[in-house]
Swiss-Prot record:
A single active site specifically recognizes both ATP and CTP and is responsible for their addition. HAMAP family: CCA_bact_type1, CCA_bact_type2. CTP binds at residues 8, 11, 91, 137, 140. Mg(2+) binds at residues 21, 23. The gene is cca. Its EC number is 2.7.7.72, 3.1.3.-, 3.1.4.-. This is Multifunctional CCA protein. Catalyzes the addition and repair of the essential 3'-terminal CCA sequence in tRNAs without using a nucleic acid template. Adds these three nucleotides in the order of C, C, and A to the tRNA nucleotide-73, using CTP and ATP as substrates and producing inorganic pyrophosphate. tRNA 3'-terminal CCA addition is required both for tRNA processing and repair. Also involved in tRNA surveillance by mediating tandem CCA addition to generate a CCACCA at the 3' terminus of unstable tRNAs. While stable tRNAs receive only 3'-terminal CCA, unstable tRNAs are marked with CCACCA and rapidly degraded.
C-alpha cells in the first residue's frame, strides 16, 4: 500500500498559497484493508475514507468510464491494480493532476508544473469533454487564479464550447450547478467566472437571462461602460474587492435582468426594468435552487435598487414604505445587505468606482430614526391592534420628516426656481 498527496494541496503548495485541506490517494490497497485499519467510509459513489485520526480524505486509486449523460453518468473502477498514473489521468486539469509521495517527491505525468509556471488552465485528456460539470469547474478556477495571470488554454476552451453545444450541461442537477456557481461567486474574480462561461457558450445554456444582458446599451450619462453585461461584470468585481458575502453577490448578479427584456427600439432607456425583472429573478432562483436568503434579497434588490439610488430624493412617506417593506425593525441585517448590493451597483460603473455613495449613510440614518420611535408611550395611551399600528406609522413618518429636514437642510424640499 502506497499513499500519495494529490490535487489542490500539491497545486497550492507549488503556487506558494496556503493549503487549507489535503487529499490523499491510496494505491495497492482494497477497501477491506482500509476498513481494517480503522478508516471510515464516506464515499457514496466511489471508495473514499476518512483517516481515523486526522479526518482527512483518503480515496482508493480509481479509473472512470463514461456510461450515461451528465455529471453522474460514470462507472468507476477501484482496485489494488489501478496505478497512480491512471488515477491522475482521470482528473480535469493538469495543475490538479500532480501528486507527491511520502518523501515529498513530485509525480507529474501530465506536466502540471509546467502549466503552473506558464499560467495555463489546461485539460488532462479528451475525456474532459465527458463531464459537463468541468465547464463550471474550469470557469471557477479561472475566477480563483485570474489575479495570478492564469487563463484557459485555447484547446480547453474549445472542449468547453463542445460541451456547451452538446446539450450535456442540461443534465447537471441544480444542486451541483449551485455548488459550483456559489463557490465561484466567492472567488477573487467572480466576473471572470461569468466571462469564461460566456466565452465558451455555457452562460447561454445555464443562465440565459444573464447572457441576454450583453450587447444591451444603457444611457451613457449614467453608465459610461454602456453595455449592461459589462456593467454586471464590473459590479461583481466591486463585490469581490469589498469582500461582500454570497447573498449580496447573488443579488448583484440578478439585479438588472429586466434590462434584457427591453425592446431594442426603446434602448438605451429601460423603463420599469425593476418590475419586469422580478419574474426572471424568480425563475433563476427556482432553477438554481438558491437558498432562501439569496432568493429573498435578490428579489428585493431587483425591485428596489433604484429607490436606493434615489434615496435622497424620496419623500418621507415613500421612505417609510421602503423601510417597512424590508422589515428593518426585526431584520436590520437584510437592509444592510440591500444597501451593500446597491452600493456595489453604483460603483460598478466605468470611472465611478471610487465615487462616494451618500445614499448608504442616509438610509442607515433613516432606519435608525424610524427604529428610535418608542412604542411604550403609545401603549400607555391605551392604543392596541390596528390603532396602535397606525399611530406607530404616524410617529415614524414624523421622525423621518424631521430626519430628512435635519440631514438635508435646505435640500429637504425642492429648491425654488426663478
Amino acid at each position: 500500500m502506497r499513499i500519495y498527496k494529490v490535487g489542490g494541496a500539491v497545486r497550492d503548495r507549488l503556487l506558494g498559497r496556503p493549503v487549507s485541506e489535503v487529499d490523499w490517494v491510496v494505491v495497492g490497497a482494497s477497501a477491506e484493508e482500509l476498513l481494517a485499519l480503522g478508516y471510515r467510509p464516506v464515499g457514496a459513489d466511489f471508495p473514499v475514507f476518512l483517516h481515523p485520526r486526522t479526518g482527512e480524505e483518503y480515496a482508493l486509486a480509481r479509473t472512470e468510464r463514461k456510461s450515461g449523460r451528465g455529471y453522474g453518468g460514470f462507472t468507476f473502477h477501484a482496485s489494488p491494480e489501478v496505478t497512480l498514473e491512471e488515477d491522475l489521468l482521470r482528473r480535469d486539469l493538469t495543475i490538479n493532476a500532480m501528486a507527491e509521495d511520502e518523501q515529498g517527491r513530485l509525480i507529474d505525468p501530465c506536466h502540471g508544473r509546467r502549466d503552473l509556471e506558464q499560467r495555463w488552465l489546461r485539460h488532462v485528456s479528451p475525456a474532459f469533454a465527458e463531464d459537463p460539470l468541468r465547464v463550471l469547474r474550469v470557469a471557477r478556477f479561472a475566477a480563483r487564479y485570474a489575479p495570478l495571470g492564469f487563463r484557459v488554454a485555447p484547446e480547453t476552451r474549445a472542449l468547453m464550447r463542445q460541451l456547451a453545444e452538446s446539450g450535456e450541461l442540461q443534465a447537471l442537477t441544480a444542486e451541483r450547478s449551485w455548488k459550483e456557481i456559489s463557490r465561484a461567486l466567492l472567488e477573487p474574480r467572480p466576473d471572470v467566472f461569468i466571462r469564461t462561461l460566456r466565452d465558451c457558450g455555457a452562460l447561454h445554456e445555464l443562465l440565459p437571462e444573464i447572457d441576454a444582458l450583453f450587447g444591451v446599451p444603457q444611457p451613457a450619462a449614467h453608465h459610461p461602460e454602456i453595455d449592461t453585461g459589462e456593467h454586471l461584470l464590473a459590479v461583481l468585481r466591486q463585490c469581490a474587492e469589498h469582500g461582500q458575502p454570497l447573498v449580496v453577490r447573488w443579488a448583484c448578479l440578478l439585479h438588472d435582468l429586466g434590462k434584457g427584456t427591453t425592446p431594442a427600439e426603446e434602448w438605451p432607456r429601460h423603463i420599469a426594468h425593476e418590475r419586469k425583472g422580478l419574474k426572471l429573478i424568480r425563475a433563476v432562483n427556482t432553477r438554481c435552487k438558491a437558498p432562501r436568503d439569496c432568493q429573498e434579497l435578490s428579489l428585493l434588490v431587483g425591485e428596489y435598487h433604484s429607490h436606493c439610488h434615489r434615496a435622497l430624493e424620496l419623500r418621507p412617506a415613500t421612505l417609510l414604505e421602503l423601510l417597512q417593506r424590508f422589515d428593518v425593525y426585526r431584520r436590520p441585517q437584510r437592509f444592510e445587505e440591500f444597501i451593500a448590493a446597491c452600493e456595489m451597483d453604483a460603483r460598478g460603473r466605468l470611472g465611478l468606482e471610487r465615487r462616494d455613495y451618500p445614499q448608504a449613510g442616509y438610509l442607515r440614518g433613516a432606519a435608525a430614526a424610524a427604529r428610535a420611535v418608542a412604542v411604550q408611550p403609545l401603549l400607555e395611551k391605551g392604543l392596541a391592534g390596528a390603532a396602535l399600528g397606525e399611530a406607530l406609522k404616524r410617529e415614524r413618518l414624523r421622525a423621518l420628516k424631521a430626519y430628512k429636514s435635519d440631514v438635508l437642510g435646505e435640500r429637504a424640499e425642492p429648491p425654488e426656481t426663478s
